[in-house]
């Protein structure tokens, strides 16, 4: 007898099955009866593999007043995510073996959902030590560092025969600094978008592509925000994957007039003529929330002083399911971009698919649920969103991590999140 049977699971348009779970793993998928000590009837719902957010900032350690691993992971569970990958820019950053290991211990102590970690990059001397902990990637910010420094990371990974991808924030530092200097006397929110123009992103993408091709090493480009940047990436899919965020997908630079600094983010929201739309999703690998919470008083500062970032974990699935209800995307696209591809790109071999032998991670959704997005219902410490009041159709009703429900009907329950080491096989480009 198994631990758990999930019954009447609609896992595809025309396929309903029962799923047996034992010791946190999927052990049987059948249309027949499954004996289990606990049964959950999911008739009327749609069951996806547990969703994976490959781009979150939980601010822990050092900036816990913004978010920490407990509140961030609760927000993830509330939003329908069973696994997250946290970025390294904490205080201190996770850019050496000691701090990387410390962050693992923090997550294991606090997290409700499973998690992996992106490593920061400080110097080539730290790379080998971090590799022992099997990071999801090494993250670099091109707006903060030079091309020669990043080239050193590529060389070190190649010398160590380590197929760990380099994840990149693409904005050219020189273009940004020049533009900001020219616009520093303006105080209107729209000036920020002009200070980090599409050219900064596109030049940086081209530089990173050159490094990836030269070293024959995998690269993942975060939060693409312009069509031209996407066009640059497309011919080089052997080594390069890419991501879009919900705010770049659903908002444009006109949102500055309504929301001001609440929508300040890097890269900034783009004009309608250059932004990425849902119709482009078949050309992009994953959707990452870039969940980047801050204190509300920080976000109310002036355009040059307010920190960039938008909290998205608890809204993205509702927003995407609303697009599904309008025929602008499909459930199979959600499954690909928020489960299958993040697991493949970042080496989460036991995640991302509903199949025997995989972790028993599931996101259960009600396609008929309707409502309005309310930030006062968030589990995140960041109780604000530019999507406040948006009407939605479809939402998560249960999040299951290794056979354990960590969210039911909007209530987050106790969890036992684990660190998931990444197992990279070097097959990084588009599947």
Curated annotation (Swiss-Prot):
> What protein family is recorded?
Belongs to the metallo-dependent hydrolases superfamily. DHOase family. Class I DHOase subfamily.
One Pfam family here: Amidohydro_1
Task: Set out the biological process GO terms recorded for this chain's protein.
Answer: 'de novo' UMP biosynthetic process; purine nucleobase catabolic process
Cofactor: how and how many bound: Binds 2 Zn(2+) ions per subunit.
What positions are modified (N6-carboxylysine)? Answer: 139
* The protein's Enzyme Commission number: 3.5.2.3
Reaction(s) catalysed (UniProt annotation): (S)-dihydroorotate + H2O = N-carbamoyl-L-aspartate + H(+)
- Tell me which cofactor or cofactors this protein depends on: Zn(2+)
What residues sit in the active site? 290
Give the pathway listed in the UniProt entry for this protein. Pyrimidine metabolism; UMP biosynthesis via de novo pathway; (S)-dihydroorotate from bicarbonate: step 3/3
Cited function: Catalyzes the reversible cyclization of carbamoyl aspartate to dihydroorotate.
GO molecular function, a single term: allantoinase activity
The residues the record assigns to binding Zn(2+) 2 are 139, 169, 223
State what protein this is by name. Answer: Dihydroorotase
The record lists substrate as bound by 57-59, 89, 294, 308-309
Residues that bind Zn(2+) 1? 55, 57, 139, 290
The record's SUPFAM superfamilies line, in alphabetical order, gives: Composite domain of metallo-dependent hydrolases, Metallo-dependent hydrolases
Q: Which GO terms describe its cellular component?
A: cytoplasm
Q: Which UniProt keywords apply?
A: Hydrolase, Metal-binding, Pyrimidine biosynthesis, Zinc
Q: What class of enzyme is it?
A: hydrolase
């Amino acid at each position: 007898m198994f631990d758990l049977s999930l019954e009447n699971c609609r896992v595809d348009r025309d396929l309903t099955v029962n799923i047996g779970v034992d010791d946190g793993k999927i052990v049987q998928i059948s249309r027949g009866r499954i004996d289990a000590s606990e049964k959950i009837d999911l008739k009327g719902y749609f069951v996806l593999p547990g969703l994976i957010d490959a781009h979150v900032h939980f601010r822990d350690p050092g900036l816990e007043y913004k978010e920490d691993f407990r509140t961030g992971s609760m927000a993830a569970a509330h939003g329908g995510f069973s696994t997250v990958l946290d970025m390294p820019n904490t205080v201190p950053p996770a850019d050496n073996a000691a701090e990387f290991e410390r962050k693992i211990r923090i997550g294991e102590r606090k997290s409700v959902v499973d998690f992996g970690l992106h490593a920061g990059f400080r110097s080539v001397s730290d790379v080998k030590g971090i590799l022992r902990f099997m990071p999801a990637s090494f993250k670099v910010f091109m707006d903060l560092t030079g091309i020669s420094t990043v080239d050193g990371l590529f060389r070190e990974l190649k010398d160590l025969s380590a197929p760990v991808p380099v994840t990149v924030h693409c904005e050219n530092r020189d273009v940004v600094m020049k533009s900001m200097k020219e616009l520093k006397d303006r105080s209107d929110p729209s000036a920020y978008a002009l200070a980090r123009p599409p050219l900064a992103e596109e030049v940086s993408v081209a530089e990173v592509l050159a490094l990836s091709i030269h070293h024959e090493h995998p690269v993942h480009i975060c939060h693409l925000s312009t069509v031209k940047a996407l066009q640059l990436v497309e011919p080089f899919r052997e080594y390069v994957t890419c991501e879009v965020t919900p705010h770049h997908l659903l908002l444009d630079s006109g949102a500055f007039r309504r929301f001001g600094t609440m929508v300040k983010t890097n890269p900034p929201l783009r004009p309608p003529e250059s932004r990425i739309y849902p119709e482009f999703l078949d050309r992009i690998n994953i959707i990452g929330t870039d969940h980047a919470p801050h204190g509300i008083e920080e976000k109310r500062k002036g355009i040059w002083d307010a920190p960039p970032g938008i909290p998205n974990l608890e809204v993205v699935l509702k927003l995407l399911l609303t697009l599904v209800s309008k025929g602008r995307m499909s459930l199979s696209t959600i499954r690909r971009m928020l489960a299958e591809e993040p697991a493949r790109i970042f080496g989460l071999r036991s995640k991302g698919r509903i199949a025997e032998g995989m972790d028993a991670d599931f996101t259960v959704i009600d396609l008929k649920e309707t409502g309005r997005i309310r930030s006062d219902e968030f589990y995140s410490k960041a109780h604000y969103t530019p999507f406040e009041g948006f009407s939605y159709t479809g939402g998560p009703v249960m999040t299951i991590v290794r056979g354990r429900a960590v969210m039911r009907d909007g209530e987050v329950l106790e969890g036992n999140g684990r660190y998931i080491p990444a197992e990279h096989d070097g097959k990084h480009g588009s599947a």
